[in-house]
């Protein structure tokens, strides 16, 4: 399992490095998102490298809407208001008003005109008066923090440009088939081969950044006495990409090569704090603490996540392993990376992992942590019954 997960990580690193080399040369790559999102591929290039020929290729072969991904600071500098204030689109794609260069264009729609508009918008000294509104180029606001905050091609294109050492702005265009349908992965593989392009996913960029960037930093340390379980050292960690504060609770001496009893736990309001009978999160957390108390050493990492208010009371996932609303594989991948960085900061390398979910093992091993043993936690009957009623049975390690 470890070899497979590490190979996946190695493949992602290699793919992103190939893509960055292409981006630096002013070439395009194909960036796919997750099957849980739009399940599509976009042509992507660095905005500062755009040419009329590139825009024409996107219009001719991509066939989708040609957009300009910009960071929030650039959007503010150019004084570009959002297209709508109440965004009700499925994936909260943040369109601003459309734009046109104030000078140097004719009708604005030609490949040359659109390339010129993009060049004007991303120029280092660009100002609001350089652009007319509306126009034929559609800017998108990328979230600060890139794919580690929002897992879309908008953020992916900006991350690729930034990681390539270029201005953080990208030009993207959805790829459609000749018959007008959206190109899915099999179509995108053929397209990439035909046009000799690198094909990578947003998940590849997430893995690359989690491997190459330090995203958490230790910001505090204190002693904590748990009722009936003695003393723990509590370490708090801040995030460089959002406002989340994570906590690691350490008992005993965790140094050395012996595997350490470890629980990586997603914080859950309903289960951990409110004690819902329909959620086993609190029970799983207490079991983890009890196991660590009995062993005399171990670590519990509690990961905070900014869950939308409307979803906070919908968390009826079993044993802290099931999905909460909007919790896709890319979100889990990001959590695994943050959890792994915290464990590495504590000096851990080999784990006895308290989990019922094999995905957690694969996820943590992707970041060079060895899971020497999986220790399952028991489930109460009520959450199991509720989850079973919601979805068809499937194989699961319990």
Regions found by a protein language model. Give the residues of each.
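Catalytic domains of riboflavin
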Residues: 1-398
């Amino acid at each position: 399992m470890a070899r497979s997960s590490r190979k996946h990580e190695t493949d992602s690193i290699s793919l992103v490095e190939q893509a960055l080399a292409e981006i630096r040369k002013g070439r395009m790559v194909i960036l796919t998102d997750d099957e849980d999102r739009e399940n599509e591929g976009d042509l992507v290039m660095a905005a500062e490298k755009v040419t009329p020929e590139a825009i024409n290729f996107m219009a001719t072969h991509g066939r989708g809407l040609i957009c300009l991904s910009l960071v929030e600071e650039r959007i503010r500098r150019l004084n570009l208001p959002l297209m709508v204030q109440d965004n009700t689109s499925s994936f909260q794609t943040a369109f601003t008003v459309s734009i046109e260069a104030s000078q140097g264009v004719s009708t604005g729609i030609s490949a040359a005109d659109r390339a010129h508009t993009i060049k004007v918008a991303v120029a280092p000294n660009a100002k609001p008066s350089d652009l007319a509104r509306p126009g034929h180029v559609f800017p998108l606001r990328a979230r600060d923090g890139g794919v580690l905050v929002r897992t879309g091609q908008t953020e992916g294109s900006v991350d690729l440009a930034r990681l390539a050492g270029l201005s953080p702005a990208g030009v993207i265009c959805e790829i459609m088939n000749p018959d007008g349908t959206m190109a899915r992965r099999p179509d995108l593989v053929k397209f990439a081969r035909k046009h000799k392009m690198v094909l990578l996913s947003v998940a590849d960029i997430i893995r690359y950044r989690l491997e190459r960037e330090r995203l958490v930093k230790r910001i505090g340390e204190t002693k904590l006495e748990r009722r009936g379980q003695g003393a723990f050292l509590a370490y708090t960690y801040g995030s460089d990409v959002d406002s989340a504060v994570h906590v690691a609770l350490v008992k005993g001496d965790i140094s050395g090569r012996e595997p350490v009893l470890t629980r990586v736990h997603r914080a859950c309001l309903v289960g951990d704090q409110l004690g819902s009978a329909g959620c086993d999160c609190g029970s799983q957390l207490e079991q983890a603490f009890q196991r660590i108390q009995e062993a005399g050493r171990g670590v519990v990492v509690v990961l905070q996540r900014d869950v939308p208010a409307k979803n906070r009371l919908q968390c009826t996932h079993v044993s802290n392993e099931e999905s909460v609303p909007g919790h896709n594989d890319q979100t889990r991948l990001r959590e695994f990376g943050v959890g792994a960085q915290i464990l590495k900061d504590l000096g851990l390398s080999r784990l006895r992992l308290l989990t019922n979910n094999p995905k957690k093992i694969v996820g943590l091993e992707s970041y060079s942590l060895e899971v020497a043993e999986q220790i399952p936690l028991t489930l109460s009957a009520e959450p199991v019954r509720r989850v079973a009623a919601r979805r068809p049975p499937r194989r699961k390690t319990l």
